[in-house]
Each structure stands twice: as C-alpha cells, then as structure tokens.
Amino acid sequence: MHYTTDAESIPEPFRDTAEDIGSPTPGPIVPVVPPAPPGAVIPYNGGPLMVDAVINGVTLRLLVDTGAERTLITHAALARAGIDISNGTPVQIRGVTGDAAATVVSIPRLDLAGARLGPLPVIVHTLANQSIDGLLGRDVLDGFTVTVDAAARRATLVPR
C-alpha cells in the first residue's frame, strides 16, 4: 500500500493499478484542554493561609504554619475522620504559648493538594481557634512548593 498526493512518486509498475481515494474528510475540531496542574490554588486575602486536606474521606481545614515543625490535628477532627488515638504515644510539645502534653498518632493517609501522603505521624492536641482542624507543619510542607501571589490574591501549594 502506498499513500501519496503525487502520482509520480508511485513506482511505475504500480501506477496503472493505483486508485485515487481522495483526501480524508477532516473530523470535528476538538479543543485540547490541558490537565489541571497538580496542587491547590488557595484564596489569599493577606490573612492566615488555610488549606483543605482529607483523611478517610473527611475534609479538614488546616492552617499553613511555616513556624510549626510538625503537623498538628485536633482530637475532634481525628475523631470525625475515624482515627483512634487511644494507642498514641504521649509527647511534650513546645509552642508559642508554652509547653503542653500531647499525643502522636500515625494516620494512614493524608490527601493534600493532589498528593497522597502517609502513613504520617501527627501531633494530636487541642487548639484555641476552634474554627480550624489543625496546623500544617514543615514536616508536610517540606514536600511542597508554596507560592504566595499577594497581587493575584492567591497562593499555590504544589507537590515537589
């Protein structure tokens, strides 16, 4: 079989039997939609940066805390996600408000900005601000590129 737009390019012994089948009919134009980039776009209004994370299908609201060495999730949030903290390891934590007793548990998976992390040890402790479920610390943030675009009023969190 030989396809060409120039009959002279067909070898001479085969030209007499060549059949003009015409040009193919172009199909419909289908716009190519690029896949969404990995990561999360977060509205930014100049205040604390908040991000959604998922544990066991339950969405949690976490404050991005570049000053926190470890990720902390509240008792209530872990209970909503079905995480048993009774076998956790007792630890002492030190924060801006002083020292406190806490617990470390391992969560099987944390979905964040298109990335699946885990198992992941997290600190379990209460927070004064009950409108958030925890603090996203550097132990997790180190696996992401965080970019704040104040002029565009958004931040991005992209897995590295």
Where are these regions (language model features)?
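Pepsin/retropepsin-fold aspartyl endopeptidases
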Residues: 1-160
